[in-house]
Amino acid sequence: VHRNGKFYLYYGDANSGGIGVAVSDLPTGPYIDNHDRPVVGMDTPGVLLYDENNRCIKNKKGVPGAISGSENWGMWCFDPCVFVDDDGQAYMYLGGAHPDNSRIIKLKENMTEVDGSAVKPNTPGFFEASFVHKYRGKYYFSYAGHYFGKPANIEYVMSDKPMEGFRNPGVILPNPPVNDGFNNHHSIFQFKGEWYIAYHNRKVAYENNEQDQRSREYMRSVCIDRLFHNEDGTVQTVEVTRDGLEQLKNVDPYRRNEAETMAKGYGIDTEFKARGCSDRIVTSIHNGDYLKIRGVDFKNGG
């Protein structure tokens, strides 16, 4: 998240069981977390729920969670999404392991402290992977709905407010082909007036004929497809493809192109052009090394 002239990288901290933040002057880093506590932790007001006798609600194994049923694995304080609204107010969406474990909380302007208590929105089927986008004044809270036998779809709820009133649950993205029913994570973004969704499957793991179950589960390939909103504000279910989008425009070989603009490379490496500069150059070039650029328009030259 870019704000106050800084870039903020939020992450799940396994050591604290909460969500930390690292800060950098550049989007490419280096990022440093010099805070003495997580931004959101199990002790943050509203993260854990309490009964009428002010006792923390736990599952049958004694793990703090949102309900007392054995199917709840306990609160997962991770997978943060930070959204900055048009008025400058920042919110964090987080949680995991059970539909009752999603949370929303305001952030202060410094982006490293919370403002008030977390609230529990209505997120049927919620499992993990919180994400929020805004379209025509409506807020869309989407998430991985992989919950105990339920298909691992990307689902969503929508509201006129960023912290309450979420309704109309639906499926944005069905579990994609070549994903073997595993979970998913996603981002939704606008580029040149069009909306897209980024997610993952296991295509490369399958093409490499990975036999180990753990390798197939964790070797994930990034995918992008188009996303469309209906006139009533709801989101059309994405038509999931196997090969992704066509290249949006050709590469112009007669202008300066950064080194990471490549379809494939072998042997070479890239590095920053200079300290404090985000531009990259190709380095470590040896005999036999190559890079390939796809979709180049040479026009009448070349």
Task: Name every feature range the model reports, one short phrase each.
Residues 1-302:
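Carbohydrate-active catalytic/glycan-binding domains of CAZyme proteins
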